[in-house]
């Protein structure tokens, strides 16, 4: 901490404004906690649902079927109506002992000291760089999240005929986004012998006229300024070229836990998550974690109905499950602050 940094205090600080973070913040305010602050690094609150322009969201929370943006707007409004202070364009740079958070915002650097802190930073897809896919760095390469952000928030079309990599549930969300934007994928690739999702979800490829190539992986990306083609390899090692103008990497979710990894909190390298107890409490009892930043091991995770046990990918919860987890953890935090949590 430097002499120029301001020091502020609150009862509970929540890092992340997705379903888990906002659900927790709302319940804490409704439980009588006075100063609840949500810290969000982006310019809008609501998390991933903000750029998922399709249903179904909100059934568990509001008993209504909503699109992602409408759901995000509703959970933000619910939190604000409860009196939650949502601070945007605010990045936490360090998790300290004693409830100290180092923060940077357009107003400058400061230290926020909270009685309790909830980590609700969520999860992210694995990008091209982490998948070690060689080839051109041309324009037209992105993840589902980036695509949906461009289409639904910025009204931009990054490509017209991409190759889609992966067959997780989010991969088919990507297909829906492509259809809504007038994008026509030329193929969907899956390295395993079966899609990750169950029938009839993978039938979307047939209904949308997208060839589903199983036991096939991407081995190279070709192009100069823009993607022009990809080289793919099948189970026999045969390599061929597909003409396309983009590559869409989907799924392979990993917790957004970079803050935890470099902090004093105990970290599980197997799941890339903070270690928590049955109350969602971290190794430093000032800290809690909820939502997709806490990933169960594959042996402990329940297989969702839309996945096969054989091809179950990294466990990830939907918005409704994260909302529920946020509320449960918030109840534990409220009990902790009152001295009634074991």
What are these regions (language model features)?
Residues 2-342:
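Residues forming the flavin
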């Amino acid at each position: 901490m430097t002499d120029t940094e301001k020091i502020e205090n609150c009862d509970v600080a929540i890092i992340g404004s997705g379903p888990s973070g906002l659900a927790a913040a709302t319940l804490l305010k409704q439980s009588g906690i006075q100063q609840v602050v949500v810290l969000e690094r982006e310019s809008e609150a609501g998390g991933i649902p903000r750029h998922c322009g399709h249903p179904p969201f909100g059934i568990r929370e509001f008993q209504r079927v909503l699109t992602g943006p409408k759901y995000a707007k509703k959970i933000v409004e619910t939190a604000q109506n409860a009196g939650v202070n949502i601070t945007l364009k605010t990045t936490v740079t360090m998790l300290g002992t004693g409830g100290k958070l180092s923060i940077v915002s357009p107003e400058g650097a400061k230290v926020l000291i909270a009685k309790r802190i909830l980590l609700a930073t969520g999860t992210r897809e694995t990008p091209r760089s982490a998948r070690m896919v060689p080839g051109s760095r041309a324009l037209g390469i992105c993840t589902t999240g980036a695509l949906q952000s461009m289409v639904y928030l910025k009204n931009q079309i990054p490509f017209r005929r991409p190759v889609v990599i992966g067959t997780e549930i989010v991969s088919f969300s990507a297909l829906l986004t492509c259809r809504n934007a007038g994008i026509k994928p030329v193929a969907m690739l899956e390295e395993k012998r079966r899609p990750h999702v169950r029938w009839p979800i993978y039938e979307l490829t047939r209904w949308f006229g997208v060839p589903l190539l199983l036991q096939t992986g991407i081995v190279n990306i070709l192009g100069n300024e823009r993607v022009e083609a990809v080289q793919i390899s099948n189970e026999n090692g045969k390599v061929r070229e597909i003409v396309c103008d983009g590559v869409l990497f989907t799924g392979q979710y990993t917790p957004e836990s970079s803050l935890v990894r470099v902090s004093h909190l105990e970290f599980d390298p197997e799941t890339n998550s903070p270690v928590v107890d049955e109350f969602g409490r971290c190794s430093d009892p000032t800290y809690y974690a909820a939502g997709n930043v806490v990933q169960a091991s594959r042996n402990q995770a329940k297989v969702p109905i839309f996945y096969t046990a054989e091809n179950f990918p990294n466990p990830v919860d939907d918005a409704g499950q994260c909302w529920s987890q946020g509320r449960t953890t918030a109840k534990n935090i409220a009990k902790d602050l009152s001295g009634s949590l074991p």
